[in-house]
């Protein structure tokens, strides 16, 4: 079904903070709109409003035709207990809800309830439109194409991380919503999955709104960009795709800064002139009063009085010019992380060694691996989901026991790590206390550092486990700045970070002088971060590509 979603004058806030207002958006068939903005700007909030899950503080959201389907597919951090892969696919494609509605309509039809015929027709049309009739057949084909070889009746809780990522992508590829809303669909996808997702989005004839931190994905898919500019409290819609958005935004910001600087310079000049004119007027008045009695010439006395009055009039005239100036507000500068990785003393020449290392986990086997990481190696590690990248890191760091072989870290190695699960800050202890304990900082210093990473009072006093993955990632990055490291291990560090933070992280990695192990599927990061070695992991086999 061809459908158009329209938002008019939407407004939303969080507590006393307004996120956005006056937001207008039309999502027509074939549109692919990228939604960008810093963490906390309201991107997920807006998607939930467009989906009809949350109500806006002001404004309306309408759908034409009203019977069209809208699919909101967020990232699901936790797997639902007892739910099978097949049930996940049915739920996230909307088929499960459509089946329940069709079953209820069938019962009403059998009972001969008033309006049951029309209700059944609507329910059946929705069931068919969402692809329920052939979901099982399509699910078998899509999961096979993705390499998800598990039985679809297997509980999702039993899946590996790579398998769970493939199941999530399968639910997206199987969806047939009339309007699709995607919240960070690229998280946890490998390069093959990213390519399949790009093809899916580009082939859709229905409208799509998506949030993503993957710059290559945005460049290749979106035709418009809606920016939630939190620092300026503005909503901006740009045409020309993601590249056009970046260019136009830079031009706008440059013009806004120049316009403000011109206004500020003009105002400062007028204010200086007014001060000088008032000073001359005041000086003239004092001189007139002092010399008036001693000056016998009446015309000279009149001239001096008139001169001081003219200076006062000029000052008033300049004040009016200042009042008539059209005020230009100073553009607010974006929050900048300005991160640096604190350096520890250099380690020994050999940083990490695996000799004949084998790790077995059920049917999966990593190795045998023979590998040596030397001081100042900058290693990119790539491979498909489930190929063993995270297992390789854990083996090198001694986080897991080997079934065969040996693993060792060299002398003087100090590890700084961001793991894929963001498991460092997950307990019930307040973030501030947990961070101070791990970092060794005093609470006041820990609070200051966390604030630099966008984690303020309402974050640091909450239980660490209640923070979002993005907030936990920021806390982990702050820890890297607090504690000196000489072996930096990053497993999918861009997941859950916004674009400004990712760019700051890339700059920090560029200046980092120690040893680096980087696992990422972010194609832009792989291009801009300097690496000296490339390890490829494929089904448990590690190949050093040099």
Which residues fall in each region the model found?
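ABC ATP-binding cassette signature C-motif
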Residues: 1-258, 342-546
């Amino acid at each position: 079904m061809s459908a158009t979603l329209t938002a008019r004058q939407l407004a939303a806030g969080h507590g006393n903070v307004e996120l956005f207002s006056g937001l207008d958006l039309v999502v027509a068939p074939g549109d692919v709109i990228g939604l960008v903005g810093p963490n906390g700007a309201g991107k997920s909030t807006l998607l939930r409003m467009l989906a009809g899950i949350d109500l806006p503080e002001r404004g309306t959201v309408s759908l034409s035709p009203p019977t069209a389907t809208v699919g909101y597919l967020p990232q699901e951090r936790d797997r639902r207990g007892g739910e099978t892969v097949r049930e996940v696919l049915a739920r996230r494609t909307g088929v499960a809800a459509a089946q329940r509605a069709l079953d209820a309509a069938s019962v009403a039809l059998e009972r001969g309830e008033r309006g049951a015929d029309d209700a059944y027709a609507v329910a059946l049309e929705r069931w068919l439109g969402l692809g329920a009739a052939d979901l099982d057949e399509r699910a078998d084909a899509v999961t096979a194409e993705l390499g998800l070889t598990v039985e679809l009746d297997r509980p999702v809780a039993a899946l590996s991380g790579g398998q769970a990522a493939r199941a999530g992508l399968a639910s997206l590829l199987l969806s047939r919503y009339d309007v699709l809303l995607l919240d960070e669909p690229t998280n946890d996808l490998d390069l093959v999955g990213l390519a399949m997702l790009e093809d899916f989005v580009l082939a859709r004839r229905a409208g799509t709104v998506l949030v993503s931190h993957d710059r290559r994905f945005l460049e290749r898919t979106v035709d418009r960009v809606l920016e939630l500019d939190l620092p300026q409290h503005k909503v901006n819609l740009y045409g020309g795709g993601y590249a056009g958005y970046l260019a136009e935004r830079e031009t706008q910001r440059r013009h806004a800064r120049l316009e403000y600087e011109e206004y500020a310079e003009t105002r400062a000049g007028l204010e200086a002139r007014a001060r000088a004119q008032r000073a001359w007027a005041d000086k003239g008045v004092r001189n007139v009063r002092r010399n008036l009695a001693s000056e016998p010439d009446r015309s000279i006395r009149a001239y001096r009085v008139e001169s001081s009055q003219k200076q006062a009039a000029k000052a008033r005239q300049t004040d009016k010019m200042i009042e008539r100036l059209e005020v230009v507000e100073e553009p607010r500068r974006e929050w900048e992380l300005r991160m640096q990785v604190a350096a520890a003393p250099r380690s020994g020449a050999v940083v990490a060694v695996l000799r004949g290392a084998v790790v077995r986990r059920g049917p999966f086997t990593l190795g045998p691996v023979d590998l040596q990481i030397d001081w100042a190696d900058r290693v990119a590690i790539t491979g498909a989901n489930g190929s063993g990248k995270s297992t390789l890191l854990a083996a090198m760091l001694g986080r897991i026991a080997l079934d065969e072989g040996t693993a060792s870290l060299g002398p003087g190695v100090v590890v700084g790590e961001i793991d894929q699960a963001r498991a460092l800050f997950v307990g019930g202890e307040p973030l501030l206390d947990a961070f101070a304990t791990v970092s060794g900082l005093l609470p006041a210093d820990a609070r200051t550092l966390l604030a630099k990473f966008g984690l303020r009072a309402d974050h640091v006093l909450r239980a660490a486990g209640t923070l979002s993955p993005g907030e936990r990632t920021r806390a982990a990055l702050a820890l890297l700045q607090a504690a000196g490291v000489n072996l930096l291990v990053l497993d999918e560090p861009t997941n859950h970070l916004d674009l400004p933070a990712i760019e700051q992280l890339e700059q920090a990695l560029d200046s980092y002088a120690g040893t680096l192990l980087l696992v990422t599927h972010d194609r832009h990061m792989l291009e801009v971060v300097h690496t000296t070695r490339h390890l490829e992991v494929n089904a448990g086999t590690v190949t050093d590509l040099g």
